[in-house]
Curated annotation (Swiss-Prot):
Positions of D-glyceraldehyde 3-phosphate binding: 53
Enzyme Commission (EC) number: 4.1.2.13
GO MF terms, alphabetically ordered: fructose-bisphosphate aldolase activity; zinc ion binding
Enzyme class: lyase
InterPro entries reported for this sequence: Aldolase_TIM, FBA_II, Fruct_bisP_bact
Keywords: Glycolysis, Lyase, Metal-binding, Zinc
Keyword Transit peptide in record: no
Record-given protein name: Fructose-bisphosphate aldolase
Entry's family note: Belongs to the class II fructose-bisphosphate aldolase family.
GO cellular component labels: cytosol
Binding site for dihydroxyacetone phosphate: 213, 250-252, 271-274
Pathway: Carbohydrate degradation; glycolysis; D-glyceraldehyde 3-phosphate and glycerone phosphate from D-glucose: step 4/4
Length: 340
């Protein structure tokens, strides 16, 4: 199917919220990881979200120029073509963008999509993330207001992170402490600044103990029930039931019960990067170890072209990552829930 239109993306999010499921948002860094994500969604009969971080976009731009906009646009254009071959709806998103990278990433991409919309085309991306979690909340929300207005004009949804997620994601890092929990007051201030849909739709990455990266279960205290408190606190103030569309960041190592509680309390999008990176890399490492005398020219031998052909190990990587995407759709209940 074509990349999701703004109308289809809104329908996807509405269906997820009503059905208490969420879409895996898969970080990609190449055409190969993109194909793996799309394959996983197709095999699971799940619509989904594919996203590009600032680091991913820089990598896609090539190590000569490292231009984030070029990298993101190139993969997005490729995605618009290749997605036609998959029987599911896919939304394109850009992941964490801190203040110092806005002018080199999200703002130019918003301007590009605005021009496309003015020309009668759809936006290149369906949503963008502003990560102001390192900024004071007042400054964070002031920038979010500006970006939300621009995004709305381009028919794009904005994702905002108002309080820190622990660990590190593309250079944005936070300590693991009590600041990792969004308060009802934080949520009310967000609603006051950004509205509850009338100023443009946004996704809220609230913090409930989340940590980016790899950690063992039990090392971090997740409180997904906090999302219910945030929704109820804002609903009591503004009179709108379940006002927020929540995003779950830093979910590696989460238990199925924690994920289930998050879904019951309004999460519609959950980011996956660490787990899919490992799933992609593991079979490649296995292939190299098992075929070291073929992928290397050892003791004067010439190796085995079939062993070191990137397509050989690349197919293994794609299949493994796709399987991890399928698993994610099952945990998040989006499997079998594609828009017919």
């Amino acid at each position: 199917m074509p990349i999701a239109t703004p109308e289809v993306y809104n329908e996807m999010l509405d269906r997820a919220k009503a059905g208490k499921f969420a879409y895996p948002a898969i970080n990609v860094t190449s055409s190969q990881t993109l194909n793996a994500a799309l394959r996983g969604f197709a095999e699971a009969e799940s619509d989904g979200i594919v996203q590009i971080s600032t680091g991913g976009a820089e990598f896609l731009g090539g190590q000569y120029s490292k231009d984030m906009v070029t990298g993101a646009v190139a993969l997005a254009e490729f995605a618009h073509i290749i997605a036609e071959k998959y029987p599911v709806n896919i939304a394109l998103h850009t992941d964490h963008c801190p203040k110092d990278k806005l002018d080199g990433y999200v703002r130019p991409l918003l301007a590009l999509s605005k021009k496309r919309v003015e020309a009668g085309l759809g936006p290149l991306f369906q949503s963008h993330m502003w990560d102001g979690s390192a900024e004071p909340l007042a400054d964070n929300l002031a920038i979010a207001q500006e970006l939300l207005e621009t995004a709305r004009a381009a028919q794009i949804i904005l994702e905002v992170e108002i309080t820190p997620t622990g660990g590190e994601e593309d250079g944005v890092s936070h300590e693991i402490n009590d600041s990792l929990y969004t308060t009802v007051d934080d949520a009310i201030r967000t609603a006051e600044a950004l509205g509850l849909g009338e100023k443009g739709r946004y996704l809220l990455a609230a913090s409930f103990g989340n940590v980016h990266g790899v950690y063992k279960p039990g090392n971090v205290v997740l409180r997904p029930e906090l999302l219910k408190e945030l929704n109820e606190g804002v609903a009591a103030r503004f009179g709108k039931e379940s006002p927020f569309d929540f995003v779950f960041h830093g979910g590696s190592g989460s238990s199925e019960e924690e994920i289930r509680t998050a879904l019951e309390n309004g999460v519609v999008k959950m980011n996956l990067d660490t787990d899919t990176q490992y799933a992609f890399t593991r079979p490649v490492a296995g292939h190299m170890f098992a075929n070291y005398d073929g992928v290397l020219k050892v003791d004067g031998e010439v190796g085995n072209k079939k062993a070191y052909d990137p397509r050989t190990w690349g197919k293994l990587a794609e299949a493994s990552m796709a399987a991890r995407v399928v698993e994610a759709t099952q945990h998040l209940r989006s499997a079998g829930n594609k828009i017919k």
